[in-house]
Amino acid sequence: MRDQFICLALLLCALHSACGLYFHISETERKCFIEEVPDETTVIVNYKVELYDPRSNGFMPSSPGIGMHVEVRDSDDKIILSRVYSSQGRISFTSHTPGEHVICMYSNSTAWFSGAQLRVHLDIQVGEHAIDYANVAQKEKLTELQLRIRQLLDQVEQITKEQNYQRYREERFRHTSESTNSRVLWWSLAQTVVLVCMGFWQMRHLKSFFEAKKLV
């Protein structure tokens, strides 16, 4: 029983994670990240842009003139978000189709900051990790017990979405495998038919050749 509880706790922690990182980009450089998201799932992206200062040999908070263009594409390669944000902000969107969502970011180029080196801090939160439960408790006036129940219900809902997404991936993989096997089978049959036809043609050609030479 204890082992089952530990496994369930690990599963709940691993399902929809929040990842924090930073990366360096230059002017016009584009960075993209792929996030696998079930359908009807909230994704929140927190970011902060810092500008390299050669005098201090470090990164400082960027000026208002520098922002980030953010573009999000769903698994069908449809743009679901595309706009320019300030140098620090919070982006939120909800997936409507399951699969890989591509989040791309690049700086809005200006002549003043042309060629500047930027450092972008990025934090992507998916699923129940994207919910601000402190804000929810304050707005809905929930007790600690009610808030905990709300969190558990959200986790169960995310587990259900994750299971549905895994079944969706398995179905796509099975369909791809069946389609590949079918193409391989038909290609093998086509090769066999071509070889039989070539052999039949060669036999007829040899027979005609021998008859013309009066060897048969």
UniProtKB/Swiss-Prot annotation:
It is a single-pass type I membrane protein. The keyword Transmembrane helix applies. Belongs to the EMP24/GP25L family. Residues 21-182 are lumenal. InterPro entries: Emp24-like (IPR015720), GOLD_dom (IPR009038). Residues 134-164 form a coiled coil. Pfam families: EMP24_GP25L. One of its GO terms (biological process) is dorsal/ventral pattern formation. Keywords: Coiled coil, Developmental protein, Endoplasmic reticulum, Membrane, Signal, Transmembrane, Transmembrane helix. Eca and bai are essential, though not redundant, for dorsoventral patterning of the embryo. Specifically required during early embryogenesis for the activity of maternal tkv, while the zygotic tkv is not affected. Involved in Golgi organization. PROSITE patterns: GOLD. It comes from Drosophila persimilis (Fruit fly). A motif (Prevents secretion from ER) lies at residues 213-216. The lineage of its organism: Eukaryota, Metazoa, Ecdysozoa, Arthropoda, Hexapoda. The keyword Cytoplasm does not apply. It is found in: Endoplasmic reticulum membrane. Its main location: endoplasmic reticulum. Residues 204-216 are cytoplasmic. This is Transmembrane emp24 domain-containing protein eca. Residues 30-126 form the GOLD domain. One of its GO terms (cellular component) is endoplasmic reticulum membrane.
